[in-house]
């Protein structure tokens, strides 16, 4: 893919003029030729950069995976956290990368319409024959901070979401998040584990959500991903099937509409949990424990009831709090 640089710059500057106009700061001659000044190296990056994947957390924070000439990059937009990983190195000059990101992603200016107006309206090719483009630093100052990190190794679809989760988990420590340090540590450890089948994309999105229920449901989906393990593994052994258990479960669901029972499967999975963790779950969810209480069953019932209260609304599930 070769990106049209004229079209990319037109998109970026057009977004800025629209932003100002919608807030009663119309830029004179909004269709005039304007672009971001760049050097030949930046032009080459803008032409060939490919946005492989991205995630947006509102209008001001975004994560992106870029590929440029078979080299892989991770970009953060609007993040306070600076990636601290030996596998990634911060690029000092991100010209070309920045225009690509601002063209491809729905990033909103982080300054006032008046500031956008003052920068964009200052010049154009139509008003000044000596115009050579807007200064890159001036245009970038209108948006949240962009950082680009080059990866020491190629990135794949399987790797990018754990990478994004690691970054978003660390970002949650910087302030304004309800996530405490211990939970952030657990999320970072989960990212490093890079477990097949876990919904890392959903986990990543929920880490910066202001509602804790979002993260609970994402973690619940992680547990759901293992529900078929017990039955599918038994079938694999009994029939001497060579395929992985999750492939067997997929075939069973597609061909026979079979899926594991949710509540009982949750208890089976929780049987592998540490006793201290199960006791902590019960304590958090106000479960009264007796000496003979089956911990996995008690924790499973409480988790499932909480899940139902979040997902459904029924009088029997409603609470006064």
Q: Which ranges hold each PLM region?
A:
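Charged, non-catalytic interaction/linker regions at domain boundaries
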Residues: 2-211, 225
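Amphipathic, oligomerization/interface secondary-structure segments
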Residues: 178-321
């Amino acid at each position: 893919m070769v990106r049209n640089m004229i079209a990319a710059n037109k998109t970026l500057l057009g977004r800025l003029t629209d932003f100002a106009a919608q807030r009663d700061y119309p830029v004179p001659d909004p269709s005039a030729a304007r672009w971001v000044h760049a050097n030949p190296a930046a032009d080459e990056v803008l032409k060939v950069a490919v946005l492989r994947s991205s995630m947006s957390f509102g209008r001001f924070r975004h994560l992106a995976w870029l590929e440029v000439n078979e080299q892989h990059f991770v970009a953060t937009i609007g993040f306070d956290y600076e990636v601290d990983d030996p596998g990634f190195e911060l690029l000092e000059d991100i010209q070309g990368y920045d225009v690509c990101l601002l063209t491809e992603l729905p990033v909103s200016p982080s300054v006032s319409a008046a500031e956008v107006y003052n920068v964009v309206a200052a010049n154009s090719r139509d008003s000044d024959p000596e115009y050579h483009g807007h200064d890159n630093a001036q245009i970038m100052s209108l948006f949240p901070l962009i950082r680009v990190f080059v990866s020491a190794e190629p990135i794949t679809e399987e790797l990018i979401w754990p990478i994004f989760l690691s970054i978003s988990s660390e970002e949650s420590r910087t302030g304004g998040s309800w996530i405490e340090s211990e939970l952030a540590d657990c999320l970072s450890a989960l990212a490093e584990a890079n477990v097949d089948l876990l919904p890392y994309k959903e986990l990543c999105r929920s880490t910066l959500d202001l509602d804790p229920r979002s993260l609970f449901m994402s973690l619940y989906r992680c547990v759901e991903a293992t529900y078929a393990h017990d039955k599918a593994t038994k079938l694999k052994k009994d029939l001497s099937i060579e395929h992985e258990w999750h492939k067997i479960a997929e075939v069973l669901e597609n061909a026979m509409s079979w899926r594991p029972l949710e509540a009982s499967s949750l208890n089976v999975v929780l049987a592998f949990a540490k006793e201290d963790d199960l006791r902590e779950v019960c304590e958090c969810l106000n479960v009264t424990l007796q000496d003979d209480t089956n911990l996995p069953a008690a924790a499973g019932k409480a988790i499932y009831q909480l899940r139902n209260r979040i997902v459904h609304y029924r009088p029997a599930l409603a609470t006064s709090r």
